[in-house]
Amino acid sequence: MKKYRLILAGLLFFTFTSAAAAGSGNYVVRAAENSPPPKIDGALEDPFWDGATVLDQFTQYEPVEGGPPSEKTIAYIGYDSRNLYIGVRAYDSNPSAIRACLTKRDEVMGDDEISIYLDTFNDKKRAFVFQVNPCGVQSDGVFTENRRRHRGGGFDRIDTSWDTFFLTNARIDNQGYTVEMQIPFKSLRFPNAQQQTWGLQVRRNIRRRNEDIYWAPRSRDINGFLVQAGTLKIDGPLEKGRNFEVMPVLTGIQAADEKFDPEPSLNLKYGITSNLTADLTVNPDFSQIEADMPQVDVNQRYPLYFPERRPFFLEGRDIFDTPIELIYTRSIVNPAFGTKLTGKTGKTSLGFLSAYDETPTYIDIPVEGDLESLQQNNRGLINIFRLKQDLYSESYIGFVLTDKETGRGWNNLTNNHNRVGGVDGHFKFDDVTRFSFQIVGSNSKVGETATGWVPAMNFDLSRQSRHWNLTASYSHLP
C-alpha cells in the first residue's frame, strides 16, 4: 500500500526563518541537599522544606501564552543520597472549586494536577513523568518527544503503562492544596556520574479554567517540549539503581479428586548500573495483569491491537519504538522464558530481547495450502535488537533487527521465519523544522514458500510554528 500525504495548514503567515528560543536557558536550579527527610503526608510542614530550592516563577501556556497565572504556585526541590523530594503549594482563591477525585492510578487527567518531568539524560528526547492530583492519586509514565501514533489509534506522548515506585500525598486546605513527592533514585535511570544535570519541567493544571502553567516557559514558536524545559543540577553521590529484585510465583489448580497441579514461575531484575537493566523471566504468570478492554472483532481487515501491560515487556519499551511500528510484543503470547537488556550508555541507547514462545502467532504470508495447518502446534524463538545513537539536539540515528523462527519443537525452529532489518532517524534543523525517516526490509518463509525481501519506508518533513504547520510525508508499506 502506498500513501502520499501533503498537508498545508495555517492561519496568518509563515516564515522560513528560525524561531526565537523560549529562554529556558535562564531556568537553571541546583537542588538543595538536606536532612532529615520529610514525612510524606502532604502538609509541607517539615523543616526539610525550609532549606529546599524554591521555584516560584511560573508562566501561563494555556489559554494565554506567556501571561501571568490566575493562581500562585510555589515548588520546592531537595534531595538526600537516596531520594528526590518535591513539594508544591498550589494556591487557589476558591478551594471548593478544585477538581479532585479518588480514582485509579494513572487516571488523574480529568483533575487539577501537578506534573514533574525529569529528563535524566538531558537529551531532550525522553523524560520520566510523575503526576499527582489534590487527593494524592498517582500517575507515572515515560514521555517520548517524537512518539508516533500507534496502530491502536493512540497519540499521547506519555506512556502510562510504565509504573515505578514513588510516594505521594496531598491535602486540600483553605488556601488551595499542597502535594509532596518522594522519588527514589533507584526508580530512575540516569548517567553514572558524580554531578547530575537533568532536564526539569514543573506543570500545574487548573482544570476548571483549562489553564496550563509551567515553571520553564513554553512557546508555540518552538517545535518541541523537552527542549523548552529548564535544568536541574544535583551534586552527588546518589544511590544508584544497582538493585536486585526476585519475584517467585506459585499458582496451581486442583479439581475434585485430581492431584494438585502446580505452576511455578520466576522473575528477576538486576540493575547492572544506574542506566542499564537486565530482566529474566521463566514461565511467567500474567494472570494478575489487568484484562484488555473489549474490542469488536467483526469485519476487521487487520488483527486487533491491544496495549502491552505485562511487566517484563514494559521495562525500556520506549527504546524499541520506531516510526513504523515493527515491534509488537503482544505477538509473544505465551513465553516459556525470556531475557532482556535495556538502557543507555553515553549517547547510545540499546535494547535486546529474546523469548521462547510456546504458542506464537502465525507468520502471515500467502502460501499454497492451509496457513494454519502449516504452523499448528509450533513453538517460536523471537530475538529483537535495537540500537539508537544520539547525534545532537533531539536528533538520532537508529538500527533495528528482529528475527522470529518457528517450528514444531526446539530442534525444528528454522522451518518458518520472519526477519526484519532497518534504519531510522530523526533530525532537527532549527527550532521549527524536523525530518524523520525509516527504511526497512522483511523476509518471511512458511514451509516451502518464501517472500524474498519486501521493502517498507516512511519519510516525514515538518515545519511547525505559531501560525503555520507544514507537513510533507511519503509512506510505502507492503
Annotate each language-model stretch with its function:
Residues 1-8:
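Bacterial N-terminal signal peptides that target proteins for export
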Residues 246-256, 264-266, 350-358, 369, ...:
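Transmembrane beta-strand segments that form the barrel wall of outer-membrane beta-barrel proteins
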